[in-house]
Amino acid sequence: MIALRENIAEMAGYVPGFQPLDVASYIKLNTNENPYPPSPKVLEAIAKEAGEGLRRYPDAASVLAREEAAKVYGFDPSWIIMANGSDEVLNNLIRACAGEGEEIAFINPSYSYYGTLAEVQGARVRTFGLTESFEPEGIPEHYDGKLFFLTNPNAPLGFTYSQRYIADLAGRLSGVLVVDEAYVDFAEETSLDLVRSFDNVVVTRTFSKSYSLAGMRLGLAIARPELIAALNKIRDHYNLDRLAQAAAAAALADQPYFKECVRKIKETRAWFTAELQKFGYQVIPSSGNFVFASPPDRDGTRIYQGLYDRKILVRHFTDPKLAHGLRISIGSREEMEQTVKALRELGPGR
């Protein structure tokens, strides 16, 4: 009998979006990847590093990547930690701040992986719901949990919380407020200024969406130096390999390419939203690189299966709050045109 911890033996685990091995056979709109390739400068940097540096250990402090991030975000590098995907930072924040039996919280629906990470640590999980107008409900006036995770823009729904609301929430918490800005580059506002204003605010970012680097597993966090120092104590000392560090620095340095990719995705998002609304879909206004859309008959399962049969992958959730709709990533204009055609073929249902 393997001597597993009881909580590990009993937990369900997180289920990521389907990743087909024959990806070229599909229009893949289920995991919010970028339809455009990384900057050519990223590919050049990776090739150079692969040819010269792989026999050496990577820089344990990811100095060059942090320096580029500092230029882009306007913080001293001591306020920044690089990560093997933003999930690494989320995990280490729980490890650093929430002990066994202590509580973390997040909004449901949002990124359910927060709960999985907390379960691994033996922390308790508390969730708060949303009203029909997407207002969080039930959060105490003064919440004393160790961590509160706020996905902004929200995923999978795509709406945003105002910076005034986030600042008010930060002031009501005795623990750390983690603003997960995985999709913020497709939105209009960021909480970075709140990191300076509040000592309990952390902002996390990923390179998987707007920088087209989901396959590299790159992320970062920005917080007060004392919290960054604590996270550095518990991360893997070589958490980013040499290729990832080179890719991160090059991606951050090529802001014109990054901004053009974001512009095209936002433009396609607006077009796709308008097309869906023409034949009766309810679409939540989105600030991410995806939309959450419900067909006229509210049968998300029917549409999901119909698209799957046509080799178009989207994300369907079994949670009763979400099962009526689909989260559809924004691909290239050509991919979205084919998706609109398929949705028209599937019709409004009953």
Curated annotation (Swiss-Prot):
<dbReference type="GO" id="GO:0004400">
    <property type="term" value="F:histidinol-phosphate transaminase activity"/>
</dbReference>
<dbReference type="InterPro" id="IPR015421">
    <property type="entry name" value="PyrdxlP-dep_Trfase_major"/>
</dbReference>
<dbReference type="InterPro" id="IPR004839">
    <property type="entry name" value="Aminotransferase_I/II_large"/>
</dbReference>
<feature type="modified residue" description="N6-(pyridoxal phosphate)lysine">
    <location>
        <position position="209"/>
    </location>
</feature>
<keyword id="KW-0368">Histidine biosynthesis</keyword>
<comment type="pathway">
    <text>Amino-acid biosynthesis; L-histidine biosynthesis; L-histidine from 5-phospho-alpha-D-ribose 1-diphosphate: step 7/9.</text>
</comment>
<keyword id="KW-0808">Transferase</keyword>
<dbReference type="InterPro" id="IPR015422">
    <property type="entry name" value="PyrdxlP-dep_Trfase_small"/>
</dbReference>
<keyword id="KW-0663">Pyridoxal phosphate</keyword>
<comment type="subunit">
    <text>Homodimer.</text>
</comment>
<dbReference type="GO" id="GO:0000105">
    <property type="term" value="P:L-histidine biosynthetic process"/>
</dbReference>
<keyword id="KW-0032">Aminotransferase</keyword>
<dbReference type="InterPro" id="IPR015424">
    <property type="entry name" value="PyrdxlP-dep_Trfase"/>
</dbReference>
<dbReference type="GO" id="GO:0030170">
    <property type="term" value="F:pyridoxal phosphate binding"/>
</dbReference>
<dbReference type="Pfam" id="PF00155">
    <property type="entry name" value="Aminotran_1_2"/>
</dbReference>
<comment type="similarity">
    <text>Belongs to the class-II pyridoxal-phosphate-dependent aminotransferase family. Histidinol-phosphate aminotransferase subfamily.</text>
</comment>
<dbReference type="InterPro" id="IPR001917">
    <property type="entry name" value="Aminotrans_II_pyridoxalP_BS"/>
</dbReference>
<keyword id="KW-0028">Amino-acid biosynthesis</keyword>
<dbReference type="InterPro" id="IPR005861">
    <property type="entry name" value="HisP_aminotrans"/>
</dbReference>
<protein>
    <recommendedName>
        <fullName>Histidinol-phosphate aminotransferase</fullName>
        <ecNumber>2.6.1.9</ecNumber>
    </recommendedName>
</protein>
